[in-house]
């Protein structure tokens, strides 16, 4: 905790960078930047300590590639789960939710379903963060900027002034209104997707016993599964070195366009097991076994952001969920945050990037990332429709559904974020050839 009224640099550096938000993306970004001694990096987190929800998060091949490029592969592999032999390449097996009938599998060769417990992953990243970078109890309440600097203000009366402010502060971002002023872009707020997600964690052995008692295969506990049905689907995958199984059961209201969350309803609530079981009444034996093992589920109202017109305003940029929050149906949210972190950290670490041209660098980042992140938002929402027999041109046609599931992730997974870096640097060399460096 910094005691004085302003967080200031103590030694001259090539760039001073303030990061708002200490989630997985923000901390990974800070770790990557901290390896360059010419960068002054300060991270501000509203909470009194780093913390993440106790849930699983899955990564596709593109996200695993970003983790490697960020230099976090060893930390990740120590805690990551993967599909057991002979299912190493399976991302998910897809089944009919009414009777457990196997439909197909989505394969990610060499990676399969790579997953971790969120809190464990954040802890592993934090272990690589040098002391003195993180500041806690720093809730951002506003951002402003001048010609040669940007300033973030916090609710404890302190401020940070630097060359760059990066908002990695989530779907309820305090930095976003500065980047997209309401008077120019209208009020941009998260909207309910129409989907509730019931979450729970089950000890793996308990689920294996429950599955066998229902006449189902116990391997369904260890191989990632997706059970599909009309307006509903359930996913499972192992975490904590296969000690636990992460479960998320989704239900979507498609009765009206753009459904609204009841006024005043909390986004996350503890609910009864009976409510959850009622939602999935009549589903398969395996699904009943899974849900009966969750005595105290939580229900999440899944929110997302519209596709934003821009992510940057001069020296201020938003990334991760602050810029492109999405529903989790492609397991892509954390991966996009990590891609963002790698691409921008690499650009800012280039010796040619300095205070006088950093706005141009942020603009180049936006140019190479905007269309991809918007497409991930859009297709993540569409994926939920596909899984719940509501996909456009697919519906409940299982032959079309299978074709879609076997190919829909290739463009997402077969992406190397270093190509974004190359494209951005090529753009910068062209646009700033007279004054770069």
PLM segments and residue spans:
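Active-site-adjacent segment of FAD-dependent monooxygenases/related oxidoreductases
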Residues: 53-128
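Short glycine-/acidic-enriched loop or helix-start segments at secondary-structure transitions
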Residues: 29, 53, 145-146, 175-178, ...
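C-terminal helical "tail/cap" subdomain of flavin- and related membrane-associated enzymes
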Residues: 3-15, 87, 93-94, 100, ...
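A generic "structured core" feature
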Residues: 17-20, 140
């Amino acid at each position: 905790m910094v005691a004085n009224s302003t967080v200031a640099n103590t030694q001259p550096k090539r760039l001073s960078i303030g990061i708002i938000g200490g989630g997985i993306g923000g901390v990974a970004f800070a770790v990557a930047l901290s390896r360059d001694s010419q960068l002054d990096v300060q991270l501000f987190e509203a909470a009194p300590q780093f913390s993440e929800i106790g849930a699983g998060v899955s990564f596709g091949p593109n996200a695993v590639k970003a983790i490697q490029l960020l230099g976090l592969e060893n930390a990740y592999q120590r805690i990551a789960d993967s599909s057991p032999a002979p299912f190493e390449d399976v991302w998910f097996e897809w089944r009919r939710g009414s009777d457990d009938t196997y439909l197909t599998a989505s394969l990610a060769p060499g990676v399969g379903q790579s997953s971790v417990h969120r809190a464990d992953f954040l802890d592993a990243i934090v272990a690589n963060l040098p002391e003195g970078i993180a500041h806690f109890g720093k809730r951002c309440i506003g951002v402003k900027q001048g010609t040669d600097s940007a300033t973030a203000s916090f609710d404890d009366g302190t401020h940070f002034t630097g060359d760059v402010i990066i908002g990695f502060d989530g779907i309820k971002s305090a930095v976003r209104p500065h980047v997209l002023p309401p008077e120019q872009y209208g009020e941009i707020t998260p909207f309910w997707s129409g989907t509730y997600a019931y979450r729970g964690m089950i000890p793996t052995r308990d689920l294996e016993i429950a599955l066998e008692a229902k006449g189902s295969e116990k391997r369904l506990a260890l191989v990632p599964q997706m059970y599909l049905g009309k307006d509903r689907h359930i996913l499972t995958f192992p975490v904590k070195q296969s000690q636990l199984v992460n479960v998320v059961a989704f239900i979507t209201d498609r009765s009206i366009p753009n459904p609204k969350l009841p006024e005043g309803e909390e986004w996350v609530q503890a609910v009864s097991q009976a409510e959850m079981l009622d939602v999935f009444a009549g589903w398969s034996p395996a699904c009943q076994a899974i849900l009966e093992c969750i005595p105290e589920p939580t229900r999440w109202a899944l929110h997302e952001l519209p596709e934003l017109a821009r992510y940057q305003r001069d020296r201020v940029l938003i990334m991760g969920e602050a810029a492109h929050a999405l529903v989790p149906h492609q397991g892509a949210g954390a991966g996009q945050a990590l891609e963002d972190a790698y691409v921008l950290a690499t650009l800012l670490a280039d010796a040619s990037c300095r205070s006088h041209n950093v706005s141009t660098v942020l603009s180049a980042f936006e140019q190479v990332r905007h269309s991809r992140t918007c497409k991930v938002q859009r297709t993540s929402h569409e994926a939920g429709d596909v899984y719940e027999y509501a996909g456009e041109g697919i519906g409940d046609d299982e032959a079309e559904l299978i074709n879609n599931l076997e190919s829909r992730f290739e463009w997402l997974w077969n992406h190397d974020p270093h190509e974004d870096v190359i494209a951005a640097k090529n753009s910068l060399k062209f646009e700033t050839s007279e004054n770069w460096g």
